């Protein structure tokens, strides 16, 4: 029986990105299903953080995925990453945070880590995850987090060039002071396509590809689960 992977999104536009990555990286017989729930991010932004409603709704989605036959669930939004552990206790399949592989790779690349975000609700979860993973690995890190004010609003207004310009400006600042920079949201991965390679003074990591590569390892029975 073919493996089935479930992706839970808060931004519908990410369905296409993760579908493409799954087709490129995962075995051909792996099936994927997507749940795109815009309400999650809208409530998180409106409330300024996670609420019991969000934890319950994510858990409901995860349980539904397991009942549909999913072998693993991948959350694709850093804002809801803290919901992974509580939801995982309710099922018998892995529930994965999208940014863990990215953070783990960043820890291998430097001690000074810059975090760029366009949504304010992702800064704290991502920064905390860096510190948690560093502590688990026995590493000492310095974390600098910057919010790209106006970029998120520009993206959802369709002003992608404005979004990219704002993010690029903040990336240049972070690159000047850190050894590696991570993008706190999967929706930010697009900026790497428009940032000239010559300007990348330090590695800049995004989460989508690394997350799907970890899924491939999990399906193969390797580390990462």
Region locations from a protein language model:
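Non-catalytic structural scaffold of enzyme domains
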Residues: 1-225
């Amino acid at each position: 029986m073919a493996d089935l992977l479930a992706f839970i999104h808060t931004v519908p536009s990410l369905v296409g990105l993760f579908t493409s990555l799954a087709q490129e990286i995962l075995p051909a017989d792996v099936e994927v299903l997507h749940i795109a729930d815009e309400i999650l991010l809208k409530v998180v932004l409106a409330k300024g953080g996670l609420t019991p409603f969000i934890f319950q709704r994510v858990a409901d989605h995860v349980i539904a995925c397991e009942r549909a036959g999913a072998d693993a669930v991948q959350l694709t939004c850093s804002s809801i990453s803290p919901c992974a552990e509580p939801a995982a206790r309710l099922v018998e399949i892995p529930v994965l945070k999208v940014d863990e592989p990215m953070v783990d790779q960043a820890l291998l690349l430097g001690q000074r880590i810059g975090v760029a975000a366009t949504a304010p609700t992702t800064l704290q979860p991502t920064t905390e995850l860096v510190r948690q993973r560093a502590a688990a690995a026995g590493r000492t890190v310095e974390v600098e987090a910057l919010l790209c004010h106006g970029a998120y609003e520009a993206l959802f207004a369709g002003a992608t060039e404005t979004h990219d310009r704002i993010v690029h400006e903040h990336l240049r600042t972070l690159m000047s002071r850190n050894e590696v920079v991570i993008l706190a949201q999967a929706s930010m991965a697009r900026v790497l396509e428009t940032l000239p390679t010559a300007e990348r003074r330090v590695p800049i990591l995004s989460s989508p590809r690394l997350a799907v590569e970890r899924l491939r390892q999990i399906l193969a029975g390797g580390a990462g689960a």
